[in-house]
């Protein structure tokens, strides 16, 4: 049995001289003078000070052991530690913001690719009229038929070609014309497309194709003897596809080559889809 559960009490039955004399030598007299009481609850009394001190030391050591054990088994996670909880919350917020920003950037990139890149993988670069032109448009003119444009007309400017200084060449073209340039788009030798009247307004090019609305696209240069360079032709094809994507051009359209001294251009474009004929302007 555990010593903490035993309480010992000593009492003297009679104050006999023999008992007193024997107790001076460390003896308690006879065995009848010793009373042992076993307390199941092990409650200490004033007659057992040593046992009370032992019990207090045992309880103290037990409480220390329990506290050390609890502290050692406490998980180091964000829920038990307020500081770590705040740090983890901050990191989760940063991670969520990064994910949202990445998703928005990806969506913007995919949208840009859809509007700028045709199906055959060639990038279409369009320079707006307000960016390259020194002149303000004097009225946008007549809007296209909302049903869609049924004709694409290709021609050339008959001017110098350009590769690096295309805005300068186009400025000279603007100054040589009375009013606006009579085209919707100009396809330059630097592989860029420059907006004139754009996708929504009729150009001032002579319309002698039964009055059908036409997208007029002019190659910058003179192509009576040789066709435009490859990147110009690819940019023109991309411009047609982009017009179809925007539903400006009808799916069943016709392609014409118009203008004087455009024989080389006609020989190149007659192999394109929807090619109809080559006509000289009146």
From Swiss-Prot:
Record's keyword annotation contains Membrane: yes
Extracellular side: 112-282
Record's bilayer topology term: Single-pass membrane protein
Keywords: Cell membrane, Disulfide bond, Glycoprotein, Immunity, Innate immunity, Membrane, Transmembrane, Transmembrane helix
Ranges per topology, Cytoplasmic: 1-88
Glycosylated residue positions: 222
Annotated family: Belongs to the N-acetylmuramoyl-L-alanine amidase 2 family.
Name the record gives this protein: Peptidoglycan-recognition protein LD
Organism of derivation: Drosophila melanogaster (Fruit fly)
Lineage: Eukaryota, Metazoa, Ecdysozoa, Arthropoda, Hexapoda
